[in-house]
Amino acid sequence: GTTWMQEITYLIYTEGDFEGSDKTPVHDRFNFIELNFEHPDPNVKVGLKRLEAETPPRLLKTHLSSNFFKKTLEKKKTKFIVVFRNPKDMLASYYNFYKMASFQFDSNGTWEEFFERFKNDKIVHGNYFDMQLSWWAYRNDPRVKIFKYEDMLKDPEQAVRQVAAFLEKDLSDDLIQKIVERTSFKSMKKNPMLNYSKFGGMDHKISPFMRKGQVGDWTNYFSKEQAKLVDEISAKKFETEGLYMEDGM
């Protein structure tokens, strides 16, 4: 859901810059701040180096917990849009990304091996439950807007309108509809500026970056025991904090 929300945010923030969306890959329009590598072009900065080189307002992307942004959150100048997804569907999606992205460690592993990594907090970015809870703690902060992937799928237009309201952008109904259409899964899947087909290090023959865009695909991967374990963790960590996630069942 990250790329989906990025494109929605970009088109709203720029008030319909479809030309920019058509010409510039989404990973160039948003600085992925935790990236840490030297770009082949010495004039191109990435991650924190790019962050330091640019001045606000900026569009940023991160998979980090809110713990990394406590000082920023305290200043109340930056807005955060956070997308949650059911942990079982997240794991199924991440497993396929894990396989197709050559820059991931041990990307040729089986689902069972990947699930063991998850159980032992050995996947990139660590414990998914703790990460979501770190942002859930800010659910009443007026500068933090939390979306659930499942709700976005149910009512894409409502999601677009909520992002527009959060960013204080008064857009026409016509532009809202155009953004909804442009950010549909069908449209994004075939858009080379969004589907990472031109991005190195990803083998789309193993798995496309944009696969299905639906709820419940986890049932094609999880054993009953694995599903039970994740449900138990969700109940213990999420539901005790008032966070409930749909799993398509």
Protein language model regions, located:
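PAPS-dependent sulfotransferase catalytic domain
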Residues: 2-147, 193-249
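Catalytic lobes of large eukaryotic enzymes
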Residues: 117-118, 165-208
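Short, solvent-exposed coil/turn elements at secondary-structure transition points
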Residues: 65, 86, 150-152, 182-185
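An amphipathic alpha-helix signature
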Residues: 88-91, 157-164, 173-176, 227, ...
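PAPS/PAP-binding and catalytic site of the sulfotransferase fold
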Residues: 3-15, 147-171, 179, 187
